[in-house]
Design a protein with these regions (language model features):
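Catalytic or ion-coupling anion/metal-binding cores of large enzyme and transporter domains
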Residues: 1-310
Length: 310
C-alpha cells in the first residue's frame, strides 16, 4: 500500500516511466497535504500482505530483512515467523528468473503486480488495506488487465511451486534461524561435507580454481552485519557455480543473497560468526544436513566440545 500499484512494474526504458514518476510525485504531495504519514499504510496487515506477495512472486530472501526492519521502524509487531507463515501459506505463481523463465519486463507486459495482487485477493491470501492512491488494495487489484495468452502469472490453484519462495529454518548451526531459498529448485534434503571460507572472495576463488565440487556444502562466514561488516550479498559465488555448471551444491552463510542468486542457498545464519555463532565452529569436512521438510540445518560435530576447547 505504500508504493502506488504498478509504479515499480514499468521498465526503466519504457516511455511511460516519466509519467509514472510524475504520478508518484503528485501522490506524495497529496498525502502530505492530507496529513498522512507512512504509519497509516505500514500495518501488520499490510506487512503480511507484502510477505505473501513476495512468496507468490518467488521473491528474494532479502524480504525478511526489509520487512522486519520496516516493522521495527514503524513500531508494528511483525517478525521473521510472520514471513515464514506467509510463505508456507502462499504458493509461487510467477514464473520469473532466476528460478523461472521470464523477466520482470515480461511480468509488466502480462498484467503486472496488479494481476498478482488480484490472484492473491481472489484466493484469500491477502486482506484489504488502504493504499497511497486513496483507494483500497482490492479496488486497485480489481482493475487488473490480464494479457490474453500470457504465461508469466498462473493461479493459486495451479501454481509454479506449492511450497512458497523461502523458509525459515533452525538447527545447531542456526539456533536463531536462517533463511533458505526455495524458489527455483525442488531439492528437499541436502547432505554433504563442508568447505569453509571466511570471505566471499575466498569462496569465489575456490570455485574458480575447481576446489569446490558436486555434493559439497560451501560455508561462507564472517560476512554478517558485524563480521562483514555490512552483510554483503553473496552473488559472486552463486553466479560462479552456475557459470561452471556446478549444480549439486549447497551454500550457507551468515551473509545474505541477491534476488538474482540461484541454487540451494541458506543465508542470514544467526547468530553470525562474529557474534560467536556456531557457524564459526564448523570445520572443513564436517557433514552438514539441510532438511526442507523438517526445517532444519545441522552439522554432525560436537560443537560444544569445540567451543569449550577455545
Amino acid at each position: 500500500g505504500l508504493s502506488p500499484m504498478g509504479a515499480n512494474d514499468v521498465p526503466a526504458v519504457d516511455p511511460a516511466k516519466g509519467a509514472e514518476g510524475e504520478r508518484c510525485g503528485r501522490l506524495i504531495v497529496e498525502r502530505v497535504f492530507a496529513g498522512d504519514t507512512a504509519r497509516k499504510y505500514i500495518t501488520r496487515a499490510s506487512l503480511k500482505n507484502a510477505a505473501a506477495a513476495v512468496s507468490a512472486s518467488g521473491g528474494s530472501t532479502n524480504a525478511v530483512l526489509h520487512l522486519t526492519a520496516i516493522a521495527i521502524e514503524a513500531g508494528v509487531a511483525f517478525g521473521v515467523e510472520d514471513c515464514n507463515t506467509a510463505c508456507e501459506d502462499t504458493a509461487v505463481i510467477c514464473d520469473l528468473k532466476p528460478g523461472g523463465r521470464f523477466l520482470a519486463s515480461h511480468l509488466y507486459a502480462s498484467g503486472g503486480t496488479r494481476l498478482v495482487t488480484q490472484r492473491l485477493a481472489e484466493s484469500g491470501k491477502i486482506v484489504n488495506a488502504p493504499t497511497v492512491s486513496g483507494r483500497s488494495l482490492f479496488a486497485e487489484a480489481a482493475e487488473a488487465e490480464e494479457t490474453p495468452g500470457q504465461q508469466v502469472v498462473t493461479t493459486i490453484a495451479a501454481p509454479i511451486s506449492q511450497r512458497g519462495s523461502f523458509a525459515v529454518i533452525y538447527g545447531d548451526i542456526a539456533p536463531d534461524g536462517a533463511v533458505l531459498k526455495l524458489s527455483g529448485h525442488k531439492v528437499d534434503r541436502f547432505e554433504g561435507p563442508a568447505c569453509v571460507f571466511v570471505s566471499e572472495e575466498d569462496a569465489f576463488q575456490a570455485v574458480q580454481d575447481g576446489a569446490v565440487g558436486e555434493g559439497d556444502v560451501i560455508v561462507i562466514r564472517y560476512e554478517g552485519p558485524r563480521g562483514g561488516p555490512g552483510m554483503r550479498e553473496m552473488l559472486q559465488v552463486t553466479a560462479a557455480l552456475k557459470g561452471r555448471g556446478i549444480h549439486d551444491v549447497a551454500l550457507i552463510t551468515d551473509g545474505r543473497f541477491s534476488g538474482a542468486s540461484y541454487g540451494f542457498v541458506a543465508g542470514h545464519v544467526s547468530p553470525e560468526a562474529a557474534a560467536g555463532g556456531p557457524i564459526a565452529l564448523i570445520r572443513d569436512g564436517d557433514r552438514i544436513t539441510i532438511d526442507v521438510t523438517a526445517r532444519r540445518i545441522d552439522v554432525a560435530a560436537d560443537l560444544a566440545a569445540r567451543r569449550a576447547s577455545h
